Amino acid sequence: MNRESFLLLLVLLFALPLHLQASSPCNNMADTTCISDSAKMFPPAIGVYHVKPMKNTLRHSLPLVAASLLTFNVDDNIRELRFTGAGSFHTKIDNVSQLVPLMAQLSMRGFGYKGRSKSWGKMLVSDALGMALMGGMVNAGKYSFGRLRPDGTAANSYPSGHTATAFACATLFHLEYGSRSPWYSVAGYTVASFTGISRIVNNRHWASDVLCGAAVGILVGELGYWISDLIFRDPTGYNYKLTKKQEGTLESMVISLSTGNRYINRQMDFEGKTVERTDAFGMNLKTTFNPSFARWVRIGLQFSVSTEKQKGLTRERPAKVFVAPAISLGLSAGVEWHPWQRASVWAEILPSILFRTDFTNAQDKPDEMSSKLHRRSSFQPAFQVGVAYRVSDHMGIEAHAGYQLGEAVYHLMEETSTWSIIKKRATVPYRGFEFAVGLQFYPFR
């Protein structure tokens, strides 16, 4: 199968549910009234309303596909970030974690904890369909694109099979037990996200491979239950959704993952040697919520990691680049405004702590500077403004710009095997602009 055939297969899989939706006799009726006669035979414990087949599935998968295509341009930057912060890290836990959500689903059913499926048979058929579709799509993509893995071991990198498996299992778990408690869904997708991140950290996949794998996993999980609902004619299947919502602060929780560049350019002079700080690529993981007593207030927690580069310049030698991870953790507080139902605009301040780090030679060559460069921990306030658009009930996109305002303390140190001494201390402004785009997730809506 060539690349064009694989893309055609994706288009057909996305278009099939829309075609069936258009032919549905309930398509032109109000969502709250379109309930089949068979549903009346099995009245649910709480109210239900009609959800158009696969509508939200496409809204969940398509943003991830778009993000995967856009991430091709920054795959090298993310890989560089991986080597800066976890160059020697390796784990095999992702071989097990990819199946944890599905094992949880089967175990809970085995212990008699009922989910949305009325029988073991229907649940197992849903699982089998989802996993079979996942295997077919992943292998079709791997052999169609033939993309080389970042470690150079094989040309079957796109999409990530481990990530697709993990998100397919998480989606199957979510569809079976998510209506019982949203925490099951949060747990499943957290494990799936960990699996995807571990594939990047293990240097086995590019970030775009992982995003496409997540899109495939979500799509096939939803397709598995959707097809089994058609086979079993289950009135409590995909077409019906519980109206019970999480009330208060929990419902407003947003988890966002964004990538971008931080433009901080300053120079330091250490004993005739000029050290120039250059642009830093990074990623932000943020959780925010709106308190129930003041929905316009925005409070959160942000974890950021970026690659800080220092270019050492001398008159006699060419520039050498030294790198280190710039890791920060901080709180955020601000205001949020919703000009439209699906759109939001916010402004916030983020007081954070920038953790200390040691710089290493980016070229992996002997250091021509006799001294080592360290950056101390420091307080780093920042300001951000951003916009977001909710694509579906559980996913959205965002873009934000910020300005970092602080100072950083650098030490030029002479080190031996037994002692170290600070030769020079420099306190310089650590200020600059940040621009980033990313995805938002709403686990409790």
From Swiss-Prot:
Major subcellular site = periplasm
What is noted besides the main data?
When grown in low hemin conditions the major lipid A species are non-phosphorylated tetraacyl and 4'-phosphate pentaacyl lipid A, while under high hemin conditions the major lipid A species are non-phosphorylated tetraacyl and 1-phosphate tetraacyl lipid A (hemin is protoporphyrin IX containing Fe(3+) with a chloride ligand (CHEBI:50385) involved in the change from healthy to diseased gums).
Q: What does this protein do?
A: Removes the 1-phosphate group from lipid A species. Absence of phosphate groups in lipid A renders the bacteria resistant to host-derived cationic antimicrobial peptides (CAMP) and allowing it to camouflage itself from the host innate immune response.
Question: What name does this protein carry?
Answer: Lipid A 1-phosphatase
**Secretion signal span:** 1-22
User: Which InterPro entries does the entry mention?
Assistant: P_Acid_Pase_2/haloperoxi_sf, P_Acid_Pase_2/haloperoxidase
Q: Where in the cell is it found?
A: Periplasm
Gene Ontology cellular component? membrane; periplasmic space
Q: In which pathway does it act?
A: Bacterial outer membrane biogenesis; LPS lipid A biosynthesis
**Keyword terms:** Hydrolase, Lipid A biosynthesis, Lipid biosynthesis, Lipid metabolism, Lipopolysaccharide biosynthesis, Periplasm, Signal, Virulence
Q: Which organism is it from?
A: Porphyromonas gingivalis (strain ATCC 33277 / DSM 20709 / CIP 103683 / JCM 12257 / NCTC 11834 / 2561)
Q: Which GO terms describe its biological process?
A: lipid A biosynthetic process; lipopolysaccharide biosynthetic process
* Annotated EC: 3.1.-.-
> Which SMART domains does the UniProt record give?
acidPPc
Instruction: Describe what happens without this gene.
Output: No longer responds to changes in hemin, decreased removal of 1-phosphate from lipid A species. Accumulates bi-phosphorylated pentaacyl and tetraacyl 1-phosphate lipid A species. Lipopolysaccharide (LPS) from this strain is a mild inducer of the human innate immune response via Toll-like receptor 4 (TLR4) in cultured HEK293 cells; double lpxE-lpxF mutants are more potent than either single mutant. No change in resistance to the cationic antimicrobial peptide (CAMP) polymyxin B. Double lpxE-lpxF mutants accumulate multiple mono- and bi-phosphorylated lipid A species.
- Does the keyword field hold Signal? yes
Question: Does the record carry Hydrolase as a key word?
Answer: yes
Q: Which gene encodes it?
A: lpxE
Q: Can you provide one Gene Ontology molecular function annotated for this UniProt record?
A: phosphatase activity
